[in-house]
Structure formats: structure tokens, C-alpha cells
Amino acid sequence: HGQKNGLMTEMGYNWRMPQLSAILGRYQLKRLDGFIERRNEIASKYAEAFKDIKEIELIKVPSYITHGYWKYPILLKKYTAKEFQTLLKEKYNIDTGTVYYPPVHLQPYYKENYGYEEGMMPSSEKNLIREICLPIFVDITDEQLNYVIESVKAELS
């Protein structure tokens, strides 16, 4: 409800969870600490690998926070997100994502109902056009992770 082709066209969302999803969720909660630990491990490897690459701006997480790393966003300086996503997919067969695009204030619902328009939130617009999310999931193998790291480094170093 509320989405059409990934764009928010009306307010609302259907949050009713099917029973099978609830059962799976309860089971997965028992493994949550392990999931978070693995995602932090992956994020640390990305951060270490990319810390000296000037074409990448990494997210900064305060040391007192345990991040869940639902996604691993990086900001690109040389490419737009779309350009780099296409490059990684076509040349290396690596799928990447975004956090949110377009930014919330440029979603049709907010533009039509609240009068938001391009240019009103320049930082969001500037960042989201250059932001991609690298693969981060608990079952990624070290071999796959190293392949992503080496592929990104090959293009941005």
C-alpha cells in the first residue's frame, strides 16, 4: 500500500505480518546477536580495506554504538551511484543497492501534499546521488567479500 514502482504515491503501508513470517522472526531473534556480530565483522573488513581510498567516503559510527549494519553505504566521489552500480554489475557481476532514492522529500506523495521540490534539501540530494550500498549479509563468504573489496579497489584506487 502506498508504493508504485518503488515511489511513495500515497501515505500508508500494510504492516500486517503473515503468521509464517512471525514464526520465522521469533526463531531468528534467537540468532540476532550472531547476525549483528557477523555484519559488524563484514563492515570492519570493508572499512579497513577502503580507509585509504580517497574516492570513497565511509560512514562514521561512534565507538559507543553497536551498529546493526542493515546496509553498508559508501559515498562515491568519482562516480554517481547509478554509474558505479552499472559498472560493478556489468564488469564484476556484483549487485549493489541504495538506502533510499529518491530522497523522501522528492517522493511524489511529499511533493504533491507538502510542496517539497528539488533543491530544498541539497545535502540529501547531493549525498543520495553518490551513495551505494555494498553487499552485506550474514551468509556472504570471505571469498565473496574479498571479491567485492578487490573489485571496488580496482576501480577506485
Which residues does each predicted region cover?
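PLP-dependent aminotransferase class I/II
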Residues: 1-157
